[in-house]
Amino acid sequence: MNNMLLKTTALLTLFLSSAAWADAASELQQRLSKVNVLSADYAQTVSSSDGKNVQQGSGTLKIKRPNLFRMDNKTPQENQIISDGKTLWFYDPFVEQVTANWVKDAVNNTPFVLLTSDDSSHWAQYNVEQKADTFTLKPKAKQSNIKQFDIRIDSEGVLRNFSTIEKDGQTNLYILRNITNQPLADGIFKFSVPKGVELDDQRQK
């Protein structure tokens, strides 16, 4: 009898947890869908696992629903992350290298693309919890490099900040400023490999 009670309690707990995750994910997607286009500057703070600030940075963010995303990091080192909806490009001018991944394969390690995604297969890779205006996403795959992705967005769809916590405990916080919602051309989210730059094409693997 006790075993049966324990099993029933465990199943009920699992069911309620799954329902809570589904509700939180639905609420987050609903809030994100309220803003179709966004441009902003961001201030980045990188902190070690013990909470010490180890680096400050800045850059610009552009998103356009559905599935278009661009981050241009300006300081302390230039790099770009661009999603054209199918391919996620990571360009590091310093080492003259571009890495290309299919978006569907990159979501697990690059949750930024969820900010513009309405693809259920992308969202299915994360459990989502909500506490007021902060949503915490945790990847289901154990091999993910990301431990946690937090998004702070209000009920009107205004994105305030987001952060990642990596497996080693390092935190990357991005605080948005100078937010505008002016139209953006799709061409902004296109990427061509610069001449002389090495392409690491993970789409072929």
UniProtKB/Swiss-Prot annotation:
A GO CC annotation given for this chain: outer membrane-bounded periplasmic space
Entries under Gene3D superfamilies matching the protein: Lipoprotein localisation LolA/LolB/LppX
Pfam families cross-referenced by the UniProt entry: LolA
Subcellular locations according to the entry: Periplasm
Signal sequence region: 1-22
InterPro entries (UniProt xref): LolA/LolB/LppX, OM_lipoprot_carrier_LolA-like, OM_lipoprot_carrier_LolA_Pbac
Record keywords, A-Z: Chaperone, Periplasm, Protein transport, Signal, Transport
GO BP: lipoprotein localization to outer membrane; lipoprotein transport
NCBIfam families attached to this UniProt entry: lolA
Annotated HAMAP family: LolA
Functional summary from the UniProt entry: Participates in the translocation of lipoproteins from the inner membrane to the outer membrane. Only forms a complex with a lipoprotein if the residue after the N-terminal Cys is not an aspartate (The Asp acts as a targeting signal to indicate that the lipoprotein should stay in the inner membrane).
Assembly and interaction partners: Monomer.
Record family assignment: Belongs to the LolA family.
Name by which UniProt lists this protein: Outer-membrane lipoprotein carrier protein
